[in-house]
Amino acid sequence: GIKGITDGEFRRATWHLDFMWGFNGVEHKKTENGVTFHGEQALIDDTWLSGEISVDSHPFVEHYKFVKALEDENTVAKQTIPAPAQFFQQFIIPANIETTRKFYSTDEELINDIANGYKKVIKDLYDAGCRNIQFDDCTWGVLVAEGSVNRYGEDADFKSISEKLLKVNNLAIEGKP
């Protein structure tokens, strides 16, 4: 089988938010309250939109190049990133939706900008030699987990949310290199 190598995500403060912080229009600060994760408060940075989403040069491309330099005839470097659905979910949760709506009046607009940002990062990773990108996606488990109403709000339409999660994931890889 393939002997994949990664950086073990050791450069990241969190497995998913650091990737988001590499995009224009995304801000973060040390949390005051944290988020509940398996009954405990996780003190991860609060992350929200401060403008429309775009990306110039994402720092994860440089992370990948570091790992790529360690390849040999028995190994292949791969890059892990949070799925586009994870990115989308972050900005539609009740804690963020009001701020998100300052920049995106519809989920469709948000989905398109996220997908376009991912396409750029995927292309840049490809140009750096990456042929193995892994999307880490916890959104589906969160969607069906006990407490999902707390995550998405009491008026959440879970069928619609699941369709949007699927759409943003598929759009991001449409036309992949």
Residue ranges of each PLM-predicted region?
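Domain-level signal for soluble alpha/beta catalytic cores
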Residues: G1-P177
